[in-house]
C-alpha cells in the first residue's frame, strides 16, 4: 500500500507545496504516495470556527484547543496504525534513521502547530510524537511538515531515478557526504581531484570515505561521537 500522509493544518493551501513538483510530484501523480491536507477549523464547534484560546496561567499568545484538535485527529486517523507526529521545536530532533523508519511504514498523520503551541492534554491522549527539525522557531508547523515529508518521500521506492543516490548521502552512513565535482575539468584555475578521473574505483571510494570523515570531524564531530558510542537498549529485568 502506498505511503499515505495526512496533514492537519490551519493552512491547507500550503500543501503539497514543493512536493507537488519534480520527482516527488511525479510520484504523487503516479500514486506512489498520497497526501491529504485537512483544515483543523472544520472541527471547531462554534459558528466562528474558533480553534484557539488564552493560555491557562496567563502569558502571551494563544493555545490550540484540545477538543478541536482531538476531533480532527480522531476523524482522520482513527486506529489506522500510522504514527501521529506533531511538529514542535521542543520535539526530538528528526534524524535520517527516523526518516527511514517512517518511509518503511504505512504513512503518517502530521499535525502542524500554530500560536504558542498545542494543549498538552491532546498530545498525551492522542499519542502525538513531537518532532523538531532544528533549534529555531518557525511561524508554524507547516514548513517543518514539508521538510519531514520531503525527507521521507524521496526515499520511497520508485521516487528517485537512481536508488543509489539515496545511499551515498550525508547521514546515511553516519557521515556527512563527500564533495562532488563534474565537468569542466578546470574551473577558474581549480582542477577536479586527479583521483576522481583516474579510473581506479577503489581509490575513488577510499578518497570519498576519507574526505567524508574529514568533513564530519570538522563540521559535525557529534556524528562521529555518536558512531563510537551507539545507543543501547536498557537492560531488561530478569524474569523469575
From Swiss-Prot:
- Please provide the record's keywords in A-Z order: Cytoplasm, Methyltransferase, S-adenosyl-L-methionine, Transferase, tRNA processing
Q: Where does S-adenosyl-L-methionine bind?
A: 113, 133-138
Where does it localize? Answer: Cytoplasm
Family matches, as SUPFAM superfamilies: alpha/beta knot
Q: What catalytic activity does the UniProt entry give for this protein?
A: guanosine(37) in tRNA + S-adenosyl-L-methionine = N(1)-methylguanosine(37) in tRNA + S-adenosyl-L-homocysteine + H(+)
Ranges of compositional bias, category Basic and acidic residues: 215-227
Q: Which intervals of the chain are annotated as region Disordered?
A: 215-240
Any one GO MF annotation of this record: tRNA (guanine(37)-N1)-methyltransferase activity
Q: Name any GO cellular component annotation.
A: cytosol
- The keyword Cytoplasm is annotated on this UniProt entry: yes
In Gene Ontology terms, what is a biological process of this protein? Answer: tRNA N1-guanine methylation
One of the Pfam families matching this protein, by short name: tRNA_m1G_MT
Q: How does it assemble?
A: Homodimer.
Q: Which family does it belong to?
A: Belongs to the RNA methyltransferase TrmD family.
State the protein's purpose: Specifically methylates guanosine-37 in various tRNAs.
The name this protein carries in UniProt is: tRNA (guanine-N(1)-)-methyltransferase
Origin species, per record, is Rhizobium meliloti (strain 1021)
Amino acid at each position: 500500500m502506498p505511503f499515505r500522509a495526512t496533514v492537519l493544518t490551519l493552512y491547507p493551501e500550503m500543501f503539497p507545496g514543493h512536493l507537488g513538483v519534480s520527482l516527488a510530484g511525479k510520484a504523487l501523480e503516479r500514486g506512489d504516495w498520497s497526501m491529504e491536507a485537512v483544515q483543523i477549523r472544520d472541527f471547531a464547534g462554534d459558528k466562528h470556527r474558533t480553534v484557539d484560546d488564552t493560555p491557562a496561567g496567563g502569558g502571551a499568545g494563544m493555545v490550540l484547543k484540545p477538543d478541536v484538535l482531538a476531533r480532527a485527529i480522531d476523524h482522520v486517523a482513527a486506529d489506522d496504525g500510522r504514527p501521529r507526529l506533531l511538529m514542535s521545536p521542543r520535539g526530538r530532533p528528526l534524524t535520517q534513521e527516523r526518516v527511514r523508519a517512517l518511509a518503511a511504514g504505512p504513512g503518517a498523520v502530521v499535525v502542524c502547530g500554530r500560536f504558542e503551541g498545542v494543549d498538552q492534554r491532546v498530545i498525551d491522549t492522542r499519542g502525538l510524537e513531537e518532532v523538531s527539525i532544528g533549534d529555531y522557531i518557525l511561524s508554524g508547523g507547516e514548513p517543518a511538515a514539508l521538510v519531514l515529508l520531503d525527507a521521507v518521500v524521496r526515499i520511497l521506492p520508485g521516487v528517485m531515478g537512481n536508488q543509489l543516490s539515496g545511499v551515498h548521502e550525508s547521514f546515511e552512513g553516519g557521515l556527512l557526504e563527500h564533495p562532488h565535482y563534474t565537468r569542466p575539468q578546470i574551473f577558474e584555475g581549480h582542477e577536479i581531484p586527479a583521483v576522481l578521473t583516474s579510473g581506479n574505483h577503489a581509490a575513488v571510494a577510499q578518497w570519498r570515505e576519507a574526505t567524508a570523515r574529514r568533513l564530519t570531524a570538522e563540521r559535525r564531530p557529534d556524528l562521529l561521537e555518536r558512531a563510537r558510542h551507539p545507543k543501547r537498549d536498557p537492560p531488561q529485568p530478569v524474569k523469575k
